């Protein structure tokens, strides 16, 4: 794979591409991202990680606590030659003494990328509206795109019988969280089968199911929302979560 040098990577481009939800990406784009992930995973094993982020900084806003997302972003930025800044609400004036719009403007001038884990979609939308650099959604109560990419990558690595993702059915055992919503939409884009299995009161909202089904019409996937636990029997992947 031919990779650009950091000096050739212009993050401050005119047409900024954010990562808000995997539903915004095509299957080809998601495949390309996973190909890069595979390359970088092997490069780390070989102690030869390319310095794609050399001289760059990512400002990480965390309204909510995190273990995996925070650590993975910090480690990734360091391995790629860059720097990650952890910014909690007590560290910056996020919507307090300073508007979210102003925070976004200021961070855009100083950082090359903004990553945000927010307690509301409105906070993320405010950052997106005024940012002049790419914004990555680290979870905003609606979507969790980086988790979805990691999950698909893991599934693909563990299905070793030659089947493609669009030949698989995934069962999600849990309530209608951002993870469930993101999984359903991502599976639908890929043409995978998706089943949410659990008590009716925890089922996904109809408007999101309708959106996923619209993706399935193009991809060939299928969606099932059920309280029948026996429906797990013909699934290839089981994803466990909690019922709150």
What are the residue ranges of the model-derived segments?
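Generic structural signal for well-ordered alpha-helical scaffold segments
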Residues: 38-42, 152-160, 184
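A short acidic, often aromatic-flanked loop/helix-cap motif at beta-alpha or helix-coil junctions
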Residues: 27, 141-145, 229-234
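Glycine-rich phosphate/diphosphate-binding loop of Rossmann-like nucleotide-binding domains
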Residues: 63-76, 157-241
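Residue-level preference for short coil/turn positions at secondary-structure junctions
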Residues: 15, 53-54, 131, 166, ...
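Conserved beta-strand segments of alpha/beta enzyme cores
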Residues: 18, 83, 134, 193, ...
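Short glycine-/small-residue-rich Rossmann-like dinucleotide-binding loops
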Residues: 38, 63, 119, 242-244
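Positively charged, low-complexity intrinsically disordered leader regions
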Residues: 1-71, 75
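Phosphate/diphosphate ligand-binding glycine-rich loop within oxidoreductases
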Residues: 45-156
């Amino acid at each position: 794979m031919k990779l650009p040098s950091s000096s050739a990577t212009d993050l401050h481009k005119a047409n900024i591409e954010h990562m808000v939800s995997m539903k915004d990406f095509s299957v080809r784009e998601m495949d390309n991202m996973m190909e890069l992930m595979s390359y970088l995973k092997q490069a780390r094993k070989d102690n030869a990680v390319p310095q794609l982020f050399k001289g760059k900084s990512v400002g990480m806003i965390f309204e909510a606590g995190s273990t995996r997302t925070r650590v993975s972003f910090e480690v990734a930025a360091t391995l790629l030659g860059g720097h990650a800044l952890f910014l909690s609400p007590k560290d910056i004036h996020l919507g307090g003494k300073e508007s979210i719009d102003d925070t976004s403007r200021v961070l855009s001038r100083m950082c090359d990328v903004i990553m945000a884990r927010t307690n509301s979609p409105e906070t993320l939308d405010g950052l997106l509206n005024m940012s002049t650099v790419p914004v990555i959604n680290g979870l905003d109560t609606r979507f969790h795109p980086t988790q979805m990419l990691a999950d698909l990558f893991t599934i693909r690595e563990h299905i070793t019988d030659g089947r493609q993702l669009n030949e698989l059915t995934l069962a999600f055992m849990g309530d209608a969280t951002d993870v469930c919503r993101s999984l359903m939409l991502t599976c639908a884009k890929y043409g995978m089968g998706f089943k949410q299995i659990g008590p009716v009161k925890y089922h996904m909202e109809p408007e999101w199911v309708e959106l996923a089904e619209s993706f399935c019409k193009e991809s060939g996937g299928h969606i099932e929302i059920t309280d029948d636990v026996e429906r797990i029997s013909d699934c290839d992947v089981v994803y466990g979560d909690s019922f709150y």
